Amino acid sequence: LAQGRPISGHVAFLGGPLHFLPELRKRFIETLKLDDEHVVKVDYGNYFVAMGAALSDEAEVIDVARLEQSIAKAKEAAARETRKADFTLFEDRADYEAFKARHDKDKVRRGDLSAYRGPVYIGIDAGSTTTKITAIGKDKEILYTSYGSNQGSPLKTVVKEMKGLYAALPEGTHIAGAMTTGYGEAIVKAALHADGGEVETFAHLRAAQEFCPDVTFVLDIGGQDMKCFFVKDGSIGNITLNEACSAGCGSFIQNFAEGLHMTPAEFAAKAIDSKAPVDLGTRCTVFMNSKVKQAQKEGADVADISAGIAFSVIKNALFKVMQLKDVRELGDHIVVQGGTFYNDAVLRCMEKLLDRDVIRPDIAGLMGAYGAAILAMEAAEEAGMQQSSLLSPDELDHFSVATSSYRCRGCGNKCLITMQKFPDGGKYFTGNRCERGIGGQKKDSDTPNIYQYKYERLFKY
């Protein structure tokens, strides 16, 4: 905010956050190195701007009637801004049932794991907020699935879920291939000795092709990310991601639901009965909170607000993230996936805005893991591999991670590198900007560094 200019003299801390959060004021004072003499103590910092407006020489004297008229005009303007959307999700219950019946056809083949015999292929999708595991058989049928929250530790979650999978495997089965994908693809592959790792966009595309071989466009909306990719001749031609922030994704809907003391599923179900969805626009979701409150003041019920939020999520994806100009750019075969599309209202808004039907697989939230499992099977068959290198149940029982940090001295950046060491001696590094700090480009030197030796001899334990 200072833009390089020094902050000096007597400083007053104004506004709600600095008024109600004393620790925030304290951190500012420490950072600016202010003493008590130069800190202006303000009793009503949260009202300071309003007080200044009241004391201004430019303030006008108006009567109560004129004030009431101005307030009424402001309310009318707010009401026009929070206008109703120009469509309803479903005309009646029969329309919704027909919608459900159409999408219930997009189902993956499933098999009975307890009765299955033969090779099993594993796909692990370590996402930003959830971990998904899918096991498939030799005919690409799903035998086992797992879907759960990372709880801040994706690696521990994967180990836990893999133990559950091993416990469910009957005699006569063996894991012939395993592949990882998602945010945690690299570390999970290194830790569990998976046979391979794949970028999540390719995993999602491979899964989408099982439902629609001629797919032309895939939209994946997860908990905190959004991926849109165009497909041409079976390959990805262009990719768009929500790089700036995670607003407008699944966690956005979940937060609103929790604010109303409802589960996301209950909140989504309310939207089905909406007859006049509230148009909340596509602005930042922080500002959208105020528009929701305004809609509530005007009498909008939960159903209309839920439908309006679903409408905003899709508008954000199509017109803000993708900056779509012409619907024809998407082609005729559209597949949507990600846990957010379990919400029927979001799916219906997608179809309404595009004015065409789309395909939502019944495993929309597992598509990354399913695609990784298929890729694992294809890689194993191509290599003639019969047994995966994945850690065994006994090795998982004794699995642990030792974490340490050190400064790289390969160049002036002096990167702070975090090393995670596994029981078998394997290592995984993060924080490095190049390969020097992890042993990739060591320089031979005949001269020993006695100070470095002394430091490591004393403290590297």
Task: State where each predicted segment sits.
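Phosphate/ATP-binding catalytic cores across multiple sugar-kinase/actin-like superfamilies
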Residues: L1-I7, A101-R110, G308-G331
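Conserved phosphate-binding/catalytic loops in two-lobed NTP-binding clefts
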Residues: L14, I29-M51, D195-T201, E351-Y370
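Flexible inter-domain linker/hinge segments
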Residues: A59-G123, G127, A380-Y461
